[in-house]
Structures are given as C-alpha cells and as structure tokens.
Amino acid sequence: MALLPILEFPDPRLRTKAVRVGVAEVVSSSFQTLLDDMFETMYAAPGIGLAATQVNVHQRFMVIDVSEEKNVPMVFINPEIVTREGDQVFQEGCLSVPGIHADVTRALSIVVRFLDRHGDEQQLTAEGLLAVCIQHEMDHLDGKLFIDYLSPLKRDMVRRKLEKQRRRAS
C-alpha cells in the first residue's frame, strides 16, 4: 500500500466533476489497490473521509470511516442520494483545506444508493456524522468544497489564511 498526495485548495483539480466508475473496473485488482491506498492515506492524514478527486483521481468514489476505533471502513462507488430529511449544522473540516473549520448546514438524514467495493448495489440510511461525511465527500465528487457554503467574505478570509500558512511552511 502507498500514501497518496492529497490536493489542497486552491488547486483547480479539486473543482473537477468526477465520472462514474464501470462495474468491471470496480473488481479489478488495480482499483482494489487504489481503494486500499485511499484508506491508508485517509487514516494517516488523519481523516474520516476521502474522495477520489482529493487524490487526483476524477472518478465517483470515496472512502469513509467515522468509527472511533477506525475499524468500520466503508466504500461508496457512484453514490447517489435518494432522499434527504431535516437539517443539521455541523462544524466541518477538510483534508484539502487544512486548518480551516466552519459551520455547514446539511441534511440530518439521507438515504444513499451506491456500489460497494465488490460492485454490489447497496442502499444505506445515514444520520448524524455519517450523513454529514457522505454529503461532504459527495460534494468533492461534484467539484464542490465545504467552504463554498460560506459567504464570499468568509471564503476570502479562508483563502488569505491558507496563503499565510503556506508562506510560513516554505
């Protein structure tokens, strides 16, 4: 397994809309290795979710593990939200927008349909943190970041803060 480089805002590749994954590709050994590498990268970061677009793979899949023990890895390939209910405000962060956290309103409960890592169709009802994480990672697959939900003024403040962090790091 290998750690993959994570793209960081404002990298324009984060704005790319991902394409669907074919079932034949899902079961290939190279795709399975990529999934394993994504989990390793997510856990090492550390994070609870990672979309393929964040590692410069522009296909519709993501890996998630919101468990405390990091022992419930979940794969979502070609995910689609079937229903959304209620609203919740959650403070989100992102591996592609390091050091930034902001309140984002998302659906409280969702039903998502997807393929699992074996190419089998699944449907899952998710609430709370898992629902937030699924919606956040699905946004990445559409080229959207959590900071896009912020006002233009707050987004500009985030951009300046990240530029300052980068200057300090170099």
Swiss-Prot record:
Q: Where does Fe cation bind?
A: 94, 136, 140
Kindly list the cofactors needed.
Fe(2+)
In terms of domain of life, where is this protein from?
Bacteria
Tell me if Iron is a UniProt keyword of this record: yes
Q: Which GO terms describe its molecular function?
A: metal ion binding; peptide deformylase activity
- Record protein name field: Peptide deformylase
Q: Where are the active-site residues found?
A: 137
Explain how, and how many, cofactor molecules are bound: Binds 1 Fe(2+) ion.
The family database entries (PANTHER family) matched by this protein are listed as: PEPTIDE DEFORMYLASE
> InterPro entries annotated for this entry?
Peptide_deformylase (IPR023635), Peptide_deformylase_sf (IPR036821)
Family that this chain belongs to: Belongs to the polypeptide deformylase family.
Please cite one Gene Ontology biological process associated with this protein: translation
Q: Name one Pfam family in it.
A: Pep_deformylase
Q: Which UniProt keywords apply?
A: Hydrolase, Iron, Metal-binding, Protein biosynthesis
Catalytic activity reported: N-terminal N-formyl-L-methionyl-[peptide] + H2O = N-terminal L-methionyl-[peptide] + formate
Q: What is its EC number?
A: 3.5.1.88
| Biological function | Removes the formyl group from the N-terminal Met of newly synthesized proteins. Requires at least a dipeptide for an efficient rate of reaction. N-terminal L-methionine is a prerequisite for activity but the enzyme has broad specificity at other positions.
